[in-house]
Amino acid sequence: MSTSTPVTEEPRSSSQMTISASTQELAELINIHLGDLRPEEPSWRVADSPISGRGIFATREIAAGEELFREHTLLVGPTAHRSMNLRTCTLCYRLIPGSTDSAALCPAGCGLPVCSECRDSTRHDLECKLFRKWKPLESQRIEPRALRILSVVRCFFLDEASRKLLYAMQANMDRYYMQEVQRAADCFEHFPREQDMLDYFYRTICAFNTNAFESRSNVDGHEVLVRALFPLAGLLNHQCTPNAAHHFENGETIVVCATERIPAGAEITMSYAKLLWSTLARKIFLGMTKHFICKCVRCQDPTENGTYLSALFCREQGCRGLVIPVQTRTLQPDWRCITCENVFPHAKMAKYQDFALNTINNRINSCSVQDMIHFINELCPRFCPSSNYVLIEAKLNVIWRMTRFDHEEYTPEEMGHMDRYREEVLAILHKLGAGECTLKKLITGEIQ
């Protein structure tokens, strides 16, 4: 797992497409979509939100750790990331046996990788016929662009109620989204040109990019990332320290639970960014991907509840104090040392943050667990405070590799370092008031 931070840019401009349903109509469509998963007496309701648009509100007091709802996806498909093995079935996400693309591709010529068990399914038959009608230009190689667009193409197979739900969801327009349509068209000889189909396709892309989640599917030890659209979960508005969190039972089912006690009438929220990112990193990410700048309580506290996730070392000679951003409503704040009180321009401190980020990222991508432990313990303290979010993510990387991904045995000393990293991360989550969040459950092994 590598750590990353967004590039410092102003948020792209976007506008919202017209929503075709009232809040009440949306709630009714959500109930239809949930089907058997809808509780007899839900602890929540859909209503207009003072944060943004529509939201989900508690109808009674909800206990910390209580499951709020689970939901199946409306649309889902592979991300086709560069790191992903493309010889993955587009339906069950199993790794397809063989070593060549051609062996994994559907023999009917649709251009989609599909396993022998799913090849004759009704679901694949629909997609296969549509892709063959469009005539894929690549017949012997798996085309990543076609895989990336598959989740959106599946909108053509939705029933009437699901289509209405899709049109009832928030859909932010962005000029870059049109490029996705063009990239999809470039994969086929006869991609549809009818305006109504293109409009529906573009609307789906906008709704998908506005609301979709990236989830993990693990089948027989083969893990892949998928992008999935969950209409109810997508209504949860953002707070940097939210009162709810989600995890996935598989790539196509989301489970949302309360992380703390939620009083009746309160809005239920989740975080769109990583909990342990610094305020500036979260603001840039949210501005670039969600087109808003968060102004929650955490974002207005330069110390972030005393966690100092943004902190860097002071650059004044002879001072080793912590420097933190002092303005919370700008993407280019001044930074002030809490020891000597010297003020530094954002451009200077951003360079030091980028140095720490790149140095740690390079190690994460190339080092063994043992080398990472030595790097974190012996070298990082020379240039990066132990509280800095980039170093925290490096410690998380070690935890994940030692507990989830690697199968080698470690020495008692190495296990001791991992346990210390775990306690440090849990202490930060406690300071943030993150409650029973998904990250805590993953670290403690409560969920896998």
UniProtKB/Swiss-Prot annotation:
EC number: 2.1.1.-
Gene that encodes it: SmydA-8
Organism from which the protein derives: Drosophila melanogaster (Fruit fly)
Family label: Belongs to the class V-like SAM-binding methyltransferase superfamily.
Secretion signal, residue range per the UniProt entry: none
CDD domains for the chain: SET_SMYD (cd20071)
One Gene Ontology term, aspect cellular component: chromatin
Keywords of the record: Methyltransferase, S-adenosyl-L-methionine, Transferase
Disulphide-bridged cysteine pairs: none
Descriptive protein name: SET domain-containing protein SmydA-8, isoform B
Occurrences of domain SET (ranges): 42-273
GO MF terms, alphabetically ordered: histone deacetylase binding; N-methyltransferase activity; protein methyltransferase activity; S-adenosylmethionine-dependent methyltransferase activity
